[in-house]
Amino acid sequence: MAVGKNKRTSKGKKGGKKKVTDVFTKKEWYDLKAPKMFLVRNFGKTLVTKTIGKKLATDSLKGRIYEVNLADLNNDEDQAHKKIKLSCDHIINRDCYTDFCGLSITRDKLCSLIRKGYTLIEGHTDVKTLDNYHLRMFCIAFTKKRQNQTKSTCYAQTSQIKKIRKKMVDIMTAEASKVLLKDLVKKFIPESIGKEIEKQCKKIYPLQNVLIRKVKILKRPKLDISKLMELHTDPKEESGKNVNALPESKEATNILTAELKH
């Protein structure tokens, strides 16, 4: 057996020890601002590399999408099954102003709704709001037992499913096409669209757990900073009354005309 040097043990390390640098010294924090349709306005912070030369920190922030639980945005645990997507559109100082970018339901909520013996009905459609946002809305519904029903299952017929799906699409299109995006988001929070679908489909087949499962933004209009800032500024309350609207007292007299008469 040939005896030789073990190259691995005899070889020393090249160079000295590397300097341990803290990565966070090159980064800075920015505050995230939610639109006024939500109760919590400051919903978190985001990290970004500091401006170095021509590479601006704001360029890295614009377009970032943040997924936030609706329970955290509205301080309501009953809304914990919904997730809201907010995109960073404008930065002022250390504040990132966001806008609505999508909605979805958590996986565990969706799994809890699907049960044996009930028909699952889904519908989706592309809609356009008054402020030229193109959205794709997905709706989900489940059948429920009729009153005094003895049968354990409640499966809907294919013809009934088609009618319900058509009703879903019509209601979603009607509700979205006549409002602005901010007003449409306000409808998503209390599930007013789902309640309307449930009400109108009652004659076809009784429904339960009708939800807007997902909302995707397909196309957005050109960014208007003034409109974006309107979403983040609360309307000022009127501090004073209109003087012209107040009724004039009967005892009030014009001093100048009174002196001329005398």
Swiss-Prot record:
Disulfide bond sites: none
Pfam families xref list: Ribosomal_S3Ae (PF01015)
Gene Ontology BP term (one): translation
GO MF, one annotated term: structural constituent of ribosome
Location of the protein in the cell: Cytoplasm
The protein's role, per its UniProt record: Component of the ribosome, a large ribonucleoprotein complex responsible for the synthesis of proteins in the cell. The small ribosomal subunit (SSU) binds messenger RNAs (mRNAs) and translates the encoded message by selecting cognate aminoacyl-transfer RNA (tRNA) molecules. The large subunit (LSU) contains the ribosomal catalytic site termed the peptidyl transferase center (PTC), which catalyzes the formation of peptide bonds, thereby polymerizing the amino acids delivered by tRNAs into a polypeptide chain.
Subunit structure comment from the entry: Component of the small ribosomal subunit. Mature ribosomes consist of a small (40S) and a large (60S) subunit. The 40S subunit contains about 32 different proteins and 1 molecule of RNA (18S). The 60S subunit contains about 42 different proteins and 3 molecules of RNA (28S, 5.8S and 5S).
Protein name as it appears in the record: Small ribosomal subunit protein eS1
Record lineage: Eukaryota, Sar, Alveolata, Apicomplexa, Aconoidasida
Gene name per UniProt: RPS3A
